[in-house]
Regions:
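Short, well-structured N-terminal submotif of metal-dependent ribonuclease cores
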Residues: 1-41, 56-68
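Short, conserved alpha-helical segments within structured domains
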Residues: 41-46, 104
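Active-site neighborhoods of divalent-metal-dependent phosphate/nucleic-acid chemistry enzymes
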Residues: 76-124
């Protein structure tokens, strides 16, 4: 299975003080142990991680440091990590995408689908996405 990690999964994984850090770490470890599992990244979730990391109230971090943290997370996945260039146009949204807040989710879901992957998220409101179990 291939999983495109969205920004909220990356933030939970990257910061120990995040309420979903432990279950996301367990899920990644469990999936890493399964043959054929890979974790995908793309520019939008990566930028989301950097933006949220810099804005966190739990600690100040620079843009460069946040990018380094993210690079370290992907390096920890070794050959289980693959970067997906994002060549999807900003059009052709699915019928469930009706609000501005849904456009990025819809785009990432389509990007994952186009690469035979599942969008891995903590958001229960994205049709067809894989919701990482946290509870």
């Amino acid at each position: 299975m291939k999983f495109l990690l969205d920004a909220n999964v990356l933030v939970a994984w990257g910061w120990k003080d995040h309420s979903d850090h432990a279950p996301v770490v367990r899920w990644i470890a469990r999936e890493r142990g399964r043959p054929g599992t890979s974790f995908l990244s793309s520019p939008i979730p990566g930028l989301g991680f950097v933006r949220v990391s810099v804005q966190r109230s739990a600690g100040q971090i620079s843009v460069a440091d946040a990018a380094d943290v993210l690079a370290g997370m992907f390096a920890a996945l070794g050959n289980r990590h693959e970067f997906l260039p994002d060549n999807q146009p900003a059009k052709g949204f699915p019928p469930w995408c009706r609000l501005a807040a849904q456009t990025t989710d819809a785009h990432l879901r389509q990007l994952a689908d186009s690469h035979g992957a599942k969008l891995a998220t903590l958001d229960h409101a994205i049709p067809g996405a894989f919701v990482v179990p946290v509870g």
